[in-house]
Amino acid sequence: MPPGGSGQGGCPRRPPALAGPLPPPPPPPPLPLLLGLLLLLGAAEGARVSSSLSTTHHVHHFHSKHGTVPIAINRMPFLTRSGHAGTTYIFGKGGALITYTWPPNDRPSTRMDRLAVGFSTHQRSAVLVRVDSASGLGDYLQLHIDQGTVGVIFNVGTDDITIDEPNAIVSDGKYHVVRFTRSGGNATLQVDSWPVNERYPAGNFDNERLAIARQRIPYRLGRVVDEWLLDKGRQLTIFNSQAAIKIGGRDQGRPFQGQVSGLYYNGLKVLALAAESDPNVRTEGHLRLVGEGPSVLLSAETTATTLLADMATTIMETTTTMATTTTRRGRSPTMRDSTTQNTDDLLVASAECPSDDEDLEECEPSTGGELILPIITEDSLDPPPVATRSPFVPPPPTFYPFLTGVGATQDTLPPPAARRPSSGGPCQAERDDSDCEEPVEASGFASGEVFDSSLPPTDDEDFYTTFPLVTDRTTLLSPRKPRPNLRTDGATGAPGVLFAPSAPAPNLPAGKMNHRDPLQPLLENPPLGPGVPTAFEPRRPPPLRPGVTSAPGFPRLPTANPTGPGERGPPGAVEVIRESSSTTGMVVGIVAAAALCILILLYAMYKYRNRDEGSYQVDQSRNYISNSAQSNGAVVKEKAPAAPKTPSKAKKNKDKEYYV
C-alpha cells in the first residue's frame, strides 16, 4: 500500500484524537445525589406537615362540631388571625366618644392614609370617625353615614373632597366593613364586597411629578412649597400635623349609636388602645366594651339551625347571623318581646342582653338545654358604673369543664373563694358519668395559641381582608372521658388540693388575659386509709347557679405552656405537646436529611475522582498501542534519529575495545 494512501486512510486521523489525555467529559448527575435531594425535600415536607397537625386538628374540630356549638373563631392557630375583628365597643343612645390624641411632638403628616372599620347600626345619619389636624391648619378626614349610606369627606389644604357609596345601605343593623384609602387628593372607598369606588379630583395630574420632585425638597421647606402650590391652584397632598382621632361623632352633634369593631388607622388600633387604658386615649359617654356587659344564653337548637343555614358563608357572616337572629328560651315574655321587636338595640353574641343599651341589668339564666356562654361579671347584680375612662374587663368566671377539657394545671384551678360546696346543677354530683358533656365558651387563649389584639398588624393588608363580628370567645367542649369522683364535702374522700389565697387580681383590660400567676398547692387533708388514693385530685368548683360558676377572685386565665416546668396537666394539654413534638421532629428531620445529603455528596465525589484516574490510564495505554502499531507517519520520523545512535555507540565501544 502506498504511503500516501495509508496516510489518507484512518491512521492519520487517530493520532490527533488520541495524542494525549483528553479532558474528562461532563459527568451525569450522580444518582445518589439526586436521591439525597429527594430525601431532603421529603423530610422537610414531612416536618412541615407534622408541624401543622394542630391546624388540621382545629379545622376538623371546627367542621365536626358546627351542629351543636357556636363557632370558635379564636380556635384557629396563630397564622389564621387575619380574620380577627379586634376590640369591639357598643355606643349607647346617649352618645359616646373615644378620642386618641397624639403627643405634641409626635404628630404625623401623611401623604397616604388608610382607614378600616367594622360597624353595625340602625341610624341613617351619624359620624363614625373623624381625624383632625392641629388647630389653625384645617386639614381633616371624616367617615360618616348619610341617608343610610357611607361617605368620606376630607380636606388636605385645597378643597373638600367627598367620596361615597350610594348603592350600599348600612343602616340595616347588619355588620358592615368599610375600607378607605387616600393618596394625595385621590381616594378609594369600598363597603363590604361592593366594587371599589374611586375618586380623582380635577387638577391632580401634576401630583405624580410633584411627588417625585418633593423628595428633593427639604422638610423645613415643605409647607412653603405647599402654600405656593395653593396660590397656584394645585391640589395639595399632605395631611399636616394630625392631632386627634375621634370615634363616635358626639363632638360633631351627630352621635353614633351601635357597634364599632376593629378600627384601624395608619397602624393605630384605637379601640384596642382604649381597652388597654392607653394614656393617650380618653373615653366619655354611654360606652361599653364588649365582654364587660351581661352575656346572652343562646339556645343550642337555634344556634345549630343558624350555623347550618349559613355554613357556606364566611366566619364573619356566620357569626353576625348568629348574633342577630338567635332567640333565647326560659325568659319572661317581656324580655322575649324586647328580643324580637326592639330594632334600635344590638344583640351581640356573648356580650349583650337584648335590652336597651342604657339598661345594664344582668341577664337572667335559664335552666338546662342551653349553651352556657361566659358571664364576665362579678356576683353582684348591681349595674356597673358608666366609665369616664376606658372600661376594664372584670375577672372571668370559672368553668370546671373548661379546666378539664383544655388541660387544667395547678395554676388554672380556682382560688378558695370559688371552692364552696353546692348542690344541684347538671354534672355536679357524679363526675364518673361520661354523658355529662357541657359545651362551654371561654377565652380563646386557652388552646395553646396566644393572641393579643393590641399587636400591630404584620402589614397593612391584614386589615383589608375580613372583619368578623366578635371574636373574644372560644367555644370548647369537654372530652367524653370518665372523670374521677370528686367529693364536695370535707368529711371523707380523697385528699384535695387547696391553693393558698393570693392577692386580689387587678382588673385586666381586654386582650391582656394571657399572663400566668402560679398558685402554690397546699395539702388540705392527709390520706384517711390504705384504700384512699394518694394522688392529688382538684376539687370541682361549686356553681353559683346551675351550670355556671362565678368566681370574682379568679386571678387570670393563663395560657398553656408546652415548655414550661412544673407538673403535667390532664389530657387536654395533648394538643400543645403535639405542637412541641412536631417542632422537635421538624428540626431533627432537617438535620438528619442534611447529614445524609453530605454523606451522599462525599461518596459521589470519591467515586467520581476514582473514575477520572482510571480513564486517564486507559488513554495512556491506548496511545501506547497506537504508537507501536504505526510504522509510518510522524511518529516513525521522530524515532528515526534514534536508530543510528545505537550503531555509532556500538562502534565507539568497539573502537575503545580495539584501542585498549
Swiss-Prot record:
Residues covered by the Laminin G-like domain: 87-295
GO cellular component terms, A-Z: cell projection; glutamatergic synapse; presynaptic membrane; protein-containing complex
One example of a Gene Ontology biological process annotation: regulation of postsynapse assembly
KW Chloroplast (keyword) present: no
Membrane-spanning residues: 585-605
Entry keyword set: Calcium, Cell adhesion, Cell membrane, Cell projection, Glycoprotein, Heparan sulfate, Membrane, Metal-binding, Proteoglycan, Repeat, Signal, Synapse, Transmembrane, Transmembrane helix
Cytoplasmic topological domain: 606-660
Topological type in the membrane: Single-pass type I membrane protein
Signal peptide (residue range): 1-46
Glycosylation sites: 186, 350, 561
InterPro entries named in the record: ConA-like_dom_sf, Laminin_G, Neurexin-like, Neurexin-related_CASP
Chain segments carrying region Disordered: 1-27, 408-458, 537-571, 627-660
Processing and modification events after translation: O-glycosylated; contains heparan sulfate. Heparan sulfate attachment is required for synapse development by mediating interactions with neuroligins.
Pfam families (UniProt xref): Laminin_G_2
This protein's record includes keyword Metal-binding: yes
Compositional bias annotation for Gly residues: 1-10
Coiled coil: none
GO MF, any single term: metal ion binding
Superkingdom as given in the UniProt entry: Eukaryota
Extracellular-facing ranges: 47-584
Family under the similarity heading: Belongs to the neurexin family.
PANTHER family, sorted: NEUREXIN-2, PIKACHURIN-LIKE PROTEIN
Record note on quaternary structure: Interacts (via cytoplasmic C-terminal region) with CASK. Specific isoforms bind alpha-dystroglycan and neuroligins NLGN1, NLGN2 and NLGN3. Interacts with CBLN1, CBLN2 and, less avidly, with CBLN4. Interacts with CLSTN3.
Summary of the function given for this chain in its UniProt record: Neuronal cell surface protein that may be involved in cell recognition and cell adhesion.
Protein name: Neurexin-2-beta
Organism from which the protein derives: Mus musculus
Underlying gene: Nrxn2
